[in-house]
Structure formats: C-alpha cells, structure tokens
Amino acid sequence: MAEITITKENFEKEVLNSTTPVLVDFWASWCGPCRMLSPVIAEISEEYEGKAKIGKVNVDEEPELAAKFGIASIPTVMVFQDGKATNTSVGYRSKAEIAAMLKETSRKF
C-alpha cells in the first residue's frame, strides 16, 4: 500500500475514523531530515500493509493541520489509534524506532 496524502479534507476519514493504527509523517520538501526519513516511511508502509495506514502531511500545503497538532519542527511522526494521537516523535528516526512506535500503539504487530 502506498502512503496516503493526508489533507484537512480527508484527515477525519483517513485518520480519526480509521479502524487500524495510522502513522502520520508531517514533512516538507525543503527539509533535509524529512527527505532522509521518506524512504524509511516507504519501507514501513510496505511492511505494515493491511495492518496500519501510513499517511503524509506536507506542512507547507496543510498549515492548518500542522497548527492543529502543534507541529513546530519537522519531520514529526505521530501514531493515531481510535482517533487519538498515541505516540509522537520529532526528528529523523531509524526504521526500527518508527516500527517500535507502531508496536507500542497496537498489539496487532
């Protein structure tokens, strides 16, 4: 499953109303650490296909979503379960660290 582009229009449907955990990557094209994290997020998306959704929010295109969740630094990765943010990480993280965030949120993994 490819990553989902999250916008203010689809945030409620794709994230808040999701029956599976959702990992959301807040990023920007000009952000070096975001570009480093992008292939890690893509790998996580492939590995957790069918078990979790993986979404990306471009903070330049969706400033309202970034503000709603207090995103001050990027990349910021948040995991949502049952409509609530359950885990947050700021800055570049390894694949193992990102996977651990999902595992902490759900016992499905």
Indicate residue ranges for each PLM-predicted region.
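Conserved redox-active cysteine motifs that mediate thiol-disulfide chemistry
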Residues: 26-40
